[in-house]
Amino acid sequence: MNSANSALVLFSGGQDSTTCLAWALTHYARVETIGFDYGQRHAIELAVRPFLLEKMRLISPEWDGRLGADHMIDLSLIAKISNTALTSNVEIAMLENGLPNTFVPGRNLLFMTVAATVAYRRGLDVLVGGMCETDFSGYPDCRDDTMKALQVTLNLGMATKLKVETPLMWIDKAATWKMAQDLGGTPLLNLVRTGTHTCYLGERGELHDWGYGCGNCPACKLRARGYADFIAG
């Protein structure tokens, strides 16, 4: 058990955040979750959150005892001030700056600030996020340096000692699948595979071996490739 005994998990309903939730439930005595409605095109991820939380409780009595309140925050202002492939019905493409147009500027910065505010109010010690620098699309707000800087800034701004944990930061998608299996066995692995949502286009009509999705967007391709590598060992 971690010396800091409580955590707030940024929980979107996707593969990474569900795995991070399992990680937090293994490491902390009290765990709460927070989700954000920012006008995302793949809003289906928000719809699957309650189902996932319910099923997580059934995987382990210990997890059930540790899992606390869920907080849903309206951040629709993000869609109003940005024009990206995650918040608008536009084709996914690369921009001149080298970033995909799925990058939502300031999203994780705002998420972490709001999460820190909720953690402050709820008396929670740690923020847990699924940011990753190994298998990602080059988003600058997923970098380890960004998260470390945010931890310093948030603590200075609120006179707290919050810790930011990113369990997936240095592992690839295959290792993320393996982590889910290690944390919750076959029940968690199957829940992540069939219950979580990653597809940027919000497609949930066809179940592939790696889960639901269009199979063509960057998120689906990354998830599918990671699953194939995981199965291959």
From Swiss-Prot:
Zn(2+) binds at C199, C214, C217, C220. ATP binds at F11, S12, G13, G14, Q15, D16, S17, T18, T19, C20, L21. One of its GO terms (biological process) is queuosine biosynthetic process. PANTHER family: 7-CYANO-7-DEAZAGUANINE SYNTHASE (PTHR42914:SF1). NCBIfam families: 7-cyano-7-deazaguanine synthase QueC. Pfam families: QueC. It catalyses: 7-carboxy-7-deazaguanine + NH4(+) + ATP = 7-cyano-7-deazaguanine + ADP + phosphate + H2O + H(+). This is 7-cyano-7-deazaguanine synthase. Belongs to the QueC family. Catalyzes the ATP-dependent conversion of 7-carboxy-7-deazaguanine (CDG) to 7-cyano-7-deazaguanine (preQ(0)). Its EC number is 6.3.4.20. Pathway: Purine metabolism; 7-cyano-7-deazaguanine biosynthesis. Its cofactor is Zn(2+). One of its GO terms (molecular function) is ATP binding. It comes from the Bacteria. It is an enzyme of class 6 (ligase). Keywords: ATP-binding, Ligase, Metal-binding, Nucleotide-binding, Queuosine biosynthesis, Zinc.
